[in-house]
Swiss-Prot record:
Organism of provenance: Azotobacter vinelandii
Designated name of the protein: Uncharacterized 10.3 kDa protein in vnfA 5'region
Pfam name, any one: NifU
Gene3D superfamilies: Fe-S cluster assembly (FSCA)
Xref: InterPro entries: FSCA_dom_sf, NIF_FeS_clus_asmbl_NifU_C
Gene Ontology molecular function, alphabetical: iron ion binding; iron-sulfur cluster binding
Family statement: Belongs to the NifU family.
């Protein structure tokens, strides 16, 4: 099984987009909340900031800020969201 492509601004705009429907927003929130304790155990935290089209924006906090593993963390959230939403076009990007 190959790894999904890295989430970058460029990839987010060039790949096919299947928007996340409004009725799935509670599932997005629940998934982020379910994953937060694992991130918090390492001294970091996640905050859901926005969902637009197929892009989920998360604010990284605590030890996640500037951490070399933050891209891995976002990738893990993406994998979970792709699975629970059954939407391979979901992208998870850091909030500006």
């Amino acid at each position: 099984m190959s790894n999904p492509p890295l989430d970058t601004e460029e990839n987010a705009t060039t790949l096919a987009i299947t928007p996340i429907p409004a009725e799935s927003l509670p599932l997005v929130r629940e998934t982020v909340e379910r994953l937060r304790p694992g991130v918090q155990r390492d001294g970091g935290d996640l905050e859901l900031v926005a969902v637009q089209d197929n892009i989920v924006r998360l604010r990284l906090k605590g030890a996640c800020v500037g951490c070399a593993m933050s891209a891995q963390t976002l990738g893990g959230v993406r994998r979970e969201l792709v699975k629970v939403l059954d939407n391979p076009s979901v992208r998870v990007l850091p909030a500006p």
